Amino acid sequence: MSLDNLTIASRYSKALFELAVEKDQTEAFLAELKQLRQVFVDNPQLAEVLSGSLLPVDQKQTTLSTLTDHASEYIKNFIQMLYDYGRMSNLVGIVDAFEARFDESRKIVHAEVTSAVKLSDEQADAIAKAFAKRVGANQVVLSRKVDEAIIGGVIVKSNNQTFDGSVALQLTNLRRALINN
């Protein structure tokens, strides 16, 4: 039975996260994993090369050693295990899942805020604090987007939730109310 990528990412990230918690190394693991993820994102063919038969095993091992040269023993062993089990193509997904577990454990929420004009840092911070309070998060990491079509106000999207405080929505609701009455 073949496992899907989400299941693989979930299982491996869970095991690694549990180890990180046990060793009190969650932040360090995450930092190392993010660096490795970036290498694989920047070089999408790397996982295929490490998984395929184009390179001899000794060259693959040399490449793995180079990749993990500055990594902790735990991360080196983890990457070696992924290689041994033919899971190098799952590395990015595993790191994404690990980061999601980290964020969940720290009550960190990622959200996108859309505004009609570019927000100042102070405005973005105020929105992040208000949103954190609303969703019970310790921290909100905002990405910003400008869309003049919303006219004014903001729309905040996070985890399949949308909080729409845009003028465009208010006008639409007003229009509906006037038409229905």
UniProtKB/Swiss-Prot annotation:
One of its GO terms (cellular component) is proton-transporting ATP synthase complex. It comes from the Bacteria. It is a peripheral membrane protein. Keywords: ATP synthesis, Cell membrane, CF(1), Hydrogen ion transport, Ion transport, Membrane, Transport. Its main location: membrane. Gene3D superfamilies: N-terminal domain of the delta subunit of the F1F0-ATP synthase. GO terms for molecular function: proton-transporting ATP synthase activity, rotational mechanism. It is found in: Cell membrane. Belongs to the ATPase delta chain family. F-type ATPases have 2 components, F(1) - the catalytic core - and F(0) - the membrane proton channel. F(1) has five subunits: alpha(3), beta(3), gamma(1), delta(1), epsilon(1). F(0) has three main subunits: a(1), b(2) and c(10-14). The alpha and beta chains form an alternating ring which encloses part of the gamma chain. F(1) is attached to F(0) by a central stalk formed by the gamma and epsilon chains, while a peripheral stalk is formed by the delta and b chains. PANTHER family: ATP SYNTHASE DELTA CHAIN. F(1)F(0) ATP synthase produces ATP from ADP in the presence of a proton or sodium gradient. F-type ATPases consist of two structural domains, F(1) containing the extramembraneous catalytic core and F(0) containing the membrane proton channel, linked together by a central stalk and a peripheral stalk. During catalysis, ATP synthesis in the catalytic domain of F(1) is coupled via a rotary mechanism of the central stalk subunits to proton translocation. This protein is part of the stalk that links CF(0) to CF(1). It either transmits conformational changes from CF(0) to CF(1) or is implicated in proton conduction. This is ATP synthase subunit delta. It comes from Lactiplantibacillus plantarum (strain ATCC BAA-793 / NCIMB 8826 / WCFS1) (Lactobacillus plantarum). The lineage of its organism: Bacteria, Bacillati, Bacillota, Bacilli, Lactobacillales. The gene is atpH.
